[in-house]
Amino acid sequence: MFLDRDGVLNRTTVRGDTPYPPNTLAEVEILPGVPDALDALRARGLPLIVVTNQPDVARGTQTREVVEQINQFLMRRLHIDAVYACYHDNGDDCACRKPKPGMLMRAADEHGIDLSRSFMVGDRWGDVAAGAAAGCETILVNMPYSQCHRCSPDHKVADLREAADVILRRLDESSLP
């Protein structure tokens, strides 16, 4: 399964209508319920893959080193199997930046994941669009900045705990892994 990072696993700082990732490792705050939700998903044998846009690197307001420190911390702390990060900005026209499905496709190829039997959990419309384009069942963690009008998720939830409940229920209903 695929997860966005900021706003799903860790707290964002919202200024105006825009969420911002932590600036330093010291600012990383794992959201309540995340470890237990991931443990429940892992117990069902789901690979936990993070796919995250980190455009502040291209914008020069963040270093790749700090982003990778945060990613490594989350991998260790939350037992994430892999993190795929896009460091491009909106205008770079890369294949990896969500809403394009490039990171999901690459991860699926590298980890032998059947996208049609996968889930994408994110807090913004681009996460949902990327998941849908890749053929995943999509779950939106509905936040004030999510821009829901720009996407049609399969499910809307309040947080990752609720997303895990939806996924576990769907697995039980459909005999997926």
Give residue ranges: language-model regions.
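Asp-based, Mg2+/Mn2+-dependent phosphohydrolase catalytic module
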Residues: E65-A82, G91-M120, R124-P177
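Residues that scaffold the ATP/ADP-binding catalytic core of kinase and kinase-like folds
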Residues: T12, G60, V166
